[in-house]
């Protein structure tokens, strides 16, 4: 993390990232633990929603955020094609079991395995040590992240092709084959909010899988090749030298997740193909006040969830505001990575009485006017 040249810098307890910055083993433990928390939240919340589900009320008008996603994936339908919640409890329990597995893995990496994998006796493990200013190390790790993203896209595409997902156009679950039309994919990046074909949605994910797995291969191979053997010239400032750091990587990560959250908010607000009305409620209307926000267009009578708002309203507004604050975190850490010291801002504000103004070349140097 940014230390501004202080070799003995200390961080407060709430700066959790600083604890694992230079200890890759503990960094992995925090990742696995975080995954376990997500799995536990998903499983527990799904059971909570299922226990309170009322078939007399539209799903989008009650607490059904997790149930709605499962229904859109084609989970919970009986043989007649009606959503009854069959199999949903099993999905939730699997998530709870996995959360315990992830928790155990996190504990192992936290208390048993090496604090830094650079000290591991396993050669393969040592390749995942953290060297924040080493482009070979960072691109190698990035390649593995892209690999898992690509595999997730493939899993989604194959699930839709083999099992099927819910199609609001026909009101039932059907198998969906991807449409790998590159012209369509190129054009859809500009109007994806209005997409109304599940084949096009799957085609976009299939293309993403190809792009991410290609990028994963390139990054993993490049990361396994020493910089001087890549014949790419000198590792200069123009190519990112002295910019690559833990603080910079954190800022880019926050930018990515913030942008995805905002895009998801705009998409979920009005798209009824990927977010069917049956499961998430009616489309929303964008309003402006101190900040943008979305309001329900449906009659709130009978809505029992989220303080009288639909599932869609809760999903969209939470995503948007989380995305907004993630982007603020991105700007904060990006400026710190570039060397900007925010403490000097407060010092300057607190010292306005004795501040001096210097105008270069004008021959003036005096106290600031009061």
From Swiss-Prot:
Localisation per UniProt entry: Cellular thylakoid membrane
Annotated transmembrane regions: 27-47, 88-108, 140-160, 201-221, 248-268, 315-335
GO molecular function, one term: chlorophyll binding
GO biological process terms held by the UniProt record: photosynthetic electron transport chain
Keywords annotated in UniProt: Chlorophyll, Chromophore, Membrane, Photosynthesis, Photosystem I, Photosystem II, Thylakoid, Transmembrane, Transmembrane helix
Family matches, as InterPro entries: PS_antenna-like (IPR000932), PS_II_antenna-like_sf (IPR036001)
Listed Pfam families: PSII
Cofactor(s) recorded in Swiss-Prot or TrEMBL: divinyl chlorophyll a; divinyl chlorophyll b
Signal peptide: none
GO cellular component: photosystem I; photosystem II; plasma membrane-derived thylakoid membrane
Main location: membrane
Superkingdom of the organism of origin: Bacteria
Keyword Membrane: yes
Protein topology in the membrane: Multi-pass membrane protein
Oligomer and partners: The antenna complex consists of divinyl chlorophylls (a and b) and divinyl chlorophyll a/b binding proteins and binds more divinyl chlorophyll b than does the antenna complex from high-light-adapted Prochlorococcus.
Additional information: This low-light-adapted strain contains 7 pcb genes.
Family, similarity comment: Belongs to the PsbB/PsbC family. IsiA/Pcb subfamily.
Function per UniProt: The antenna complex functions as a light receptor, it captures and delivers excitation energy to photosystems II and I. The Prochlorales pcb genes are not related to higher plant LHCs.
Name of the protein described by the UniProt record: Divinyl chlorophyll a/b light-harvesting protein PcbD
């Amino acid at each position: 993390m940014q230390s501004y040249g202080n070799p003995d810098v200390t961080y407060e307890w709430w700066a959790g990232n600083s604890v694992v910055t230079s200890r890759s083993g503990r960094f992995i433990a925090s990742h696995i633990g975080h995954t376990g928390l997500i799995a536990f939240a998903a499983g527990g919340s799904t059971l909570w929603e299922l226990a309170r589900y009322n078939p007399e009320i539209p799903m989008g008008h009650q607490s059904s955020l997790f149930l709605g996603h499962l229904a859109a994936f084609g989970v919970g339908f009986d043989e007649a094609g009606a959503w009854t919640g069959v199999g949903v409890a099993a999905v939730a329990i699997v998530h709870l079991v996995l959360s315990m597995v992830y928790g155990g893995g996190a504990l192992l990496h936290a208390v048993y395995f090496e604090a830094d994998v650079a000290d591991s006796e396993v050669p393969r493990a040592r390749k995942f040590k953290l060297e924040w200013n080493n482009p070979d190390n960072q691109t190698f790790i990035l390649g593995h992240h892209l690999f898992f993203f690509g595999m997730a896209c493939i899993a989604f595409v194959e699930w839709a092709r083999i099992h099927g997902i819910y199609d609001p156009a026909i009101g039932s679950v059907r198998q969906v084959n991807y449409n790998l039309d590159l012209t369509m994919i190129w054009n859809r990046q500009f109007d994806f909010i209005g997409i109304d074909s599940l084949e096009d949605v799957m085609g976009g994910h299939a293309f993403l899988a190809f792009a991410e797995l290609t990028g994963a291969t390139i990054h993993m191979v490049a990361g396994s090749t020493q910089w001087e053997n890549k014949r790419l010239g000198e590792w200069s400032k123009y190519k990112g030298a002295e910019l690559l750091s833990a603080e910079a990587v954190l800022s880019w990560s926050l930018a990515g997740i913030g942008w995805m959250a905002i895009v998801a908010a705009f998409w979920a607000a009005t798209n009824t193909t990927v977010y069917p009305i049956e499961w998430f409620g009616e489309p929303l209307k964008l309003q402006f006040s101190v900040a943008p926000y979305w309001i329900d267009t449906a009659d709130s009578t009978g809505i029992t969830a989220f303080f009288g708002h639909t599932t869609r309203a809760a999903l969209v507004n939470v995503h948007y505001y989380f995305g907004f604050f993630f982007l603020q975190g991105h700007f904060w850490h990006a400026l710190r990575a570039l060397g900007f010291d925010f403490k000097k801002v407060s010092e300057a504000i607190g010292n306005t009485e004795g501040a001096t103004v210097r105008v270069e070349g004008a021959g003036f140097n005096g106290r600031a006017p009061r």
